[in-house]
Swiss-Prot record:
Coiled coil: none annotated. Its cofactor is Mg(2+). GO terms for biological process: L-serine biosynthetic process. It holds the Pfam family HAD. Its EC number is 3.1.3.3. Mg(2+) binds at D11, D13, D167. Gene3D superfamilies: HAD superfamily/HAD-like. The active site is at D11 (nucleophile), D13 (proton donor). Pathway: Amino-acid biosynthesis; L-serine biosynthesis; L-serine from 3-phospho-D-glycerate: step 3/3. This is Phosphoserine phosphatase. Transmembrane segments: none annotated.
């Protein structure tokens, strides 16, 4: 097996993809505005992420699980997403996703883009309907850091050989932990503290930063 040279771990909503998937689910449930407002406050760091997630998921109670198919059709990769993954793979990197979103959509995105690792939340479904609850470990800012460290260790990498990228307050600890931390079209709280920034929605810009740093 060839040696792994590095690892990129990134957020999904408003980073890998253009949309916030939970906001799309909220729209389908008829509570789009309320859900989007909570999302915005959580991403700015004004709300505890766990609390914000539970509040938003509760509004989805009673939706049929067929909703994921409908919502998936409305999701768009950000420019350069697949090209970035392909280029990193050609350089011997692994790529992982850590998302406060849901496996029901994130797993499909990962498969479509050829991504190696995924950690996301699970929505509880009983008899084909959402219960308004999540189950299992909730992907918080601390879990994002833990997965960055776990996947690095699994591949015999030092943290200096890792890249982390995201847009929201819950991505900041991960961004600060990685060798290269990137704010992607991020909220002000993230832009101010991240070592590197991408200000236009083009994920391939990661390669420019990587080359500039000379890793």
């Amino acid at each position: 097996m060839s040696e792994v040279k590095g690892l990129l771990v990134m957020d999904v909503d408003s980073t890998l993809v253009q949309e916030e998937v939970i906001d799309l689910l909220g729209e389908e449930a008829g509570v789009g505005r309320e859900v989007a407002e909570i999302t915005e406050r959580a991403m700015r760091g004004e709300l505890d992420f766990r609390q914000a997630l539970n509040e938003r998921v509760a509004t989805l109670k009673g939706l049929p699980d067929s909703i994921f198919e409908k919502v998936y059709a409305r999701i768009h990769f950000n420019k350069g997403a697949k090209e970035l993954v392909d280029e990193l793979h050609s350089r011997g990197f692994k790529v992982g996703l850590v998302s406060g979103g849901f496996h029901e959509t994130v797993d499909r995105l990962a498969k479509e883009a050829g991504i190696d690792y995924v950690k996301a939340n699970h929505l509880e479904v009983i008899d084909g309907f959402l219960t308004g609850k999540v189950y299992g470990e909730i992907v918080t800012k601390d879990v994002k850091v833990a997965k960055l460290k776990d996947w690095a260790a699994e591949n015999g990498l030092k943290l200096s050989q890792t890249i982390a990228m995201g847009d929201g307050a819950n991505d900041l600890p991960m961004i600060k932990t990685a060798g290269i931390g990137i704010a992607f079209c991020a909220k002000p709280i993230v832009r101010v503290q991240a070592p590197y920034q991408i200000t236009e929605p083009d994920l391939y810009k990661v390669i420019e930063i990587l080359d500039e740093v000379g890793k």
